[in-house]
Amino acid sequence: MNSSYFPGVLGVRWVHTNRKLQKRKEEHGAFQDSLHFMIPAAETKDLGASVTVGNSLTRAFRQVDRICQRNNVPRLFRSQRFYEKPSEKRSRVRSERHRARFRAGIVRLVNLAKNMRRWGY
């Protein structure tokens, strides 16, 4: 049985060993194995990122920490540590949404105040 390797999220490997697909491939020589739909689209995320360690090990660890922060790994780790009931999740998501909107409004007001001060008000 011939298996193909498809890179996945965070180094997860998907091995495809479907006999029907293999038979279909053999019957249709130019048939392409299109499993791109199995790999989730993550445009801003770093999938399978690697850091080269040169002279400084601490610098490499800092780069790994930055990659993890950019991908929200610590937040995901904390959120998946304990089970969260669906009603609690809805409440948390609602609260996070409200906080983000409130924060954006405050940032907008502070920027407006800075601009008004610059304009001479």
UniProtKB/Swiss-Prot annotation:
Q: Does the keyword Metal-binding apply?
A: no
Q: Ribonucleoprotein: present as a keyword of the record?
A: yes
Q: Where is the transit peptide?
A: 1-14
Q: Name one GO biological process term.
A: mitochondrial translation
Could you tell me which Pfam families the record lists for this protein? Ribosomal_S21
Record's keyword terms, sorted: Mitochondrion, Ribonucleoprotein, Ribosomal protein, Transit peptide
* Compartments reported by the entry: Mitochondrion
Q: Which GO CC annotations does the UniProt entry carry?
A: mitochondrial small ribosomal subunit; mitochondrion
- MF terms per GO, please? structural constituent of ribosome
InterPro entries per the UniProt record, alphabetical:
Mitoribosomal_bS21, Ribosomal_bS21, Ribosomal_bS21_sf
Q: How does it assemble?
A: Component of the mitochondrial small ribosomal subunit (mt-SSU). Mature yeast 74S mitochondrial ribosomes consist of a small (37S) and a large (54S) subunit. The 37S small subunit contains a 15S ribosomal RNA (15S mt-rRNA) and at least 32 different proteins. The 54S large subunit contains a 21S rRNA (21S mt-rRNA) and at least 45 different proteins.
Q: Write down the NCBIfam families for this protein, in alphabetical order.
A: S21p
Family that this chain belongs to: Belongs to the bacterial ribosomal protein bS21 family.
Primary role: Component of the mitochondrial ribosome (mitoribosome), a dedicated translation machinery responsible for the synthesis of mitochondrial genome-encoded proteins, including at least some of the essential transmembrane subunits of the mitochondrial respiratory chain. The mitoribosomes are attached to the mitochondrial inner membrane and translation products are cotranslationally integrated into the membrane.
What name does UniProt use for this protein?
A: Small ribosomal subunit protein bS21m
Q: Which organism is it from?
A: Schizosaccharomyces pombe (strain 972 / ATCC 24843) (Fission yeast)
Please name the taxonomic classification of the source. Eukaryota, Fungi, Dikarya, Ascomycota, Taphrinomycotina
